[in-house]
């Protein structure tokens, strides 16, 4: 579900970062909830501190809830109404002026659940003047909006996938595609939502990816125009995220070769783990230990690297050949 065209929530009286009427009006616009990978961080320490604070706030929020079903999640925001309605391409919105959270009724239940937690994240953020002030001091404009959306995704992950649950998945399955699939199942969220939460907590160099059958990439479709229309579906990357120390991800839409472990896992319905490679879109390959786990029509994949190899021959070659696959 990876950058959202959104606007930040704008309470009045924010220390060091007050907003005018125009910004306040922007805050109530509906917006999609898409996990955001930030391309450039001008103040990494500020963002890291803000994420840590947001996790603490979300953990405190969850601790006071009677449960984690939809009704229980709303218990921490008394006075705020929850409404489900068709929202087109938008996933949801939080309108602080009218105290209402809107959720797209046409979205899948897993998507609705993450969206609700994300919108609750907006409410949590609005309730902490110090954190709001800090991020307004450090960022502005579109970058501020991106940071706010990122913090709300951090909150959503902390609400639905708390650190002890992620730690349990990593302990049981290691940093693998199966850990990703099991986390999504346990938290009742999509694998794309679980992707970013797992990435944040994985201590070793890994690229995680969610792959699913879909239409052939545009490049391939264009080359096959003379052959006429095709109904064949190709396994492609839907979302990807990398842990600290790994500078690349797989771009959305990257095709997965038919002989790759991920394609084999989809074809057989069985987990496949073997020494293989990262299939960059250009055709270049980077060695990695691959674990591909099929689940509910998708394949959750991990590409684990030998730390000693990072920054050496393979990654230097990727650096020259794969700028389009750099982490977004």
From Swiss-Prot:
Q: Which Gene3D superfamilies match?
A: 1.10.10.2910, irre protein, IrrE, HTH domain
Query: Which InterPro entries does this chain map to?
Result: G3DSA:1.10.10.1030, IrrE_HExxH, Rad_response_metalloprotease
Give the Enzyme Commission number.
3.4.24.-
Residue spans making up a coiled coil are none
Keywords of this entry: DNA-binding, Hydrolase, Metal-binding, Metalloprotease, Protease, Stress response, Zinc
Question: What domain of life does the UniProt record list for this protein's source?
Answer: Bacteria
- GO molecular-function terms, A-Z: DNA binding; metal ion binding; metallopeptidase activity
Does this UniProt record's set of keywords contain Ligase? no
- Biological role: Plays a central regulatory role in DNA repair and protection pathways in response to radiation stress. Acts as a site-specific metalloprotease that cleaves and inactivates the repressor protein DdrO, resulting in induced expression of genes required for DNA repair and cell survival after exposure to radiation. Regulates the expression of dozens of proteins from different pathways, including the important DNA repair proteins RecA and PprA. Binds to the promoters of recA and pprA.
Q: What is known of its domains?
A: Composed of three structural domains: an N-terminal zinc-peptidase domain, a central helix-turn-helix motif, and a C-terminal GAF-type domain.
> Can you name this protein?
Radiation response metalloprotease IrrE
Native organism taxonomy: Bacteria, Thermotogati, Deinococcota, Deinococci, Deinococcales
| Protein encoded by which gene | irrE
């Amino acid at each position: 579900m990876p950058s959202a065209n959104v606007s930040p929530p704008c309470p009045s009286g924010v220390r060091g970062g007050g907003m005018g009427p125009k910004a306040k009006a922007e805050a109530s616009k509906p917006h999609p909830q898409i996990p955001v990978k930030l391309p450039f961080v001008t103040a990494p320490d500020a963002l890291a501190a803000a994420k840590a604070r947001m996790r603490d706030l979300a953990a405190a929020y969850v601790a006071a809830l009677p449960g984690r079903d939809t009704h229980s999640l709303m218990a921490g925001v008394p006075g705020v109404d929850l409404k489900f309605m068709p929202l087109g391409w938008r996933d949801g919105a939080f309108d602080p002026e009218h105290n209402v959270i809107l959720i797209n009724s046409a979205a899948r239940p897993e998507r609705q659940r993450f969206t609700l937690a994300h919108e609750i994240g907006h409410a949590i953020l609005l309730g902490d003047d110090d954190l709001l002030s800090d991020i307004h001091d450090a960022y502005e404009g579109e970058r501020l909006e991106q940071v706010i959306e990122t913090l709300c995704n951090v909150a959503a992950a902390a609400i639905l996938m708390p650190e002890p649950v992620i730690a349990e998945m990593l302990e049981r399955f290691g940093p693998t595609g199966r850990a990703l699939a099991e986390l999504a199942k346990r938290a009742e969220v999509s694998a794309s939502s679980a992707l970013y939460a797992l990435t944040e907590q994985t201590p070793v160099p890994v690229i995680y990816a969610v792959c699913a059958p879909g239409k052939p990439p545009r490049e391939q479709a264009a080359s096959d125009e003379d052959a006429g229309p095709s109904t064949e579906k190709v396994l492609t990357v839907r979302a990807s995220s990398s842990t600290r120390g790994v500078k690349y991800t797989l771009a959305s839409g990257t095709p997965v070769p038919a002989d790759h472990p991920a394609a084999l896992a989809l074809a057989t319905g069985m987990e496949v783990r073997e020494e293989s490679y990262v299939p960059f879109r250009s055709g270049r390959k980077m060695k990695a230990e691959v674990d591909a786990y099929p689940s509910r029509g998708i394949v959750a994949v991990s590409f684990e690297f030998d730390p000693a190899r990072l920054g050496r021959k393979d990654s230097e070659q990727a650096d020259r050949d794969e700028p389009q696959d750099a982490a977004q």
